[in-house]
């Protein structure tokens, strides 16, 4: 099993904010990848977006929370999206 920590966020852009929200999500994903904290995959459903984030470790997740560039992106997103559901940590089950 992987040592990565899987997090999932389901969100919708606020009215008139879709383009800016996606730009901010891309910026945040780039910051987190460049810092070696995580890797992201973004999916789109008919009415919502699903962001799947694979944190490299719990330590990386904590360190990312202190990164000024990441903090700036999260602050911007607070005005651009409405979060419908968040799974901070999902556990992999052996099949």
Locate the predicted segments by residue.
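Short beta-strand
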Residues: 40-44
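Short strand-connecting beta-turns/loops that link adjacent beta-strands
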Residues: 2, 45-48
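Short, surface-exposed ligand-recognition loops at beta-strand->loop->(often short) alpha-helix junctions
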Residues: 10-23
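Short, low-order "capping/linker" segments at domain edges
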Residues: 90-95
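Short structural boundary motif marking the start of a folded domain
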Residues: 3-7
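Feature marks short, surface-exposed loop/turn motifs that line or immediately flank catalytic pockets
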Residues: 15, 46, 58-59
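An amphipathic, aromatic/His-enriched active-site/gating alpha helix that lines ligand/cofactor pockets
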Residues: 27-39, 54-88
């Amino acid at each position: 099993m992987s040592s990565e920590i899987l997090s999932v966020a389901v969100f919708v852009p606020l009215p008139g904010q879709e383009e800016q929200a996606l730009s901010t999500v891309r910026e945040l994903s780039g910051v987190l990848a460049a810092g070696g904290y995580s890797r992201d995959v973004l999916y789109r459903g008919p009415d919502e977006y699903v962001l799947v984030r694979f944190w490299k470790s719990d330590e990386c997740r904590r360190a990312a929370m202190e990164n000024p560039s990441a903090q700036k992106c999260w602050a911007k997103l607070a005005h651009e999206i409405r979060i419908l559901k968040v799974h901070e940590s999902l556990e992999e089950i052996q099949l």
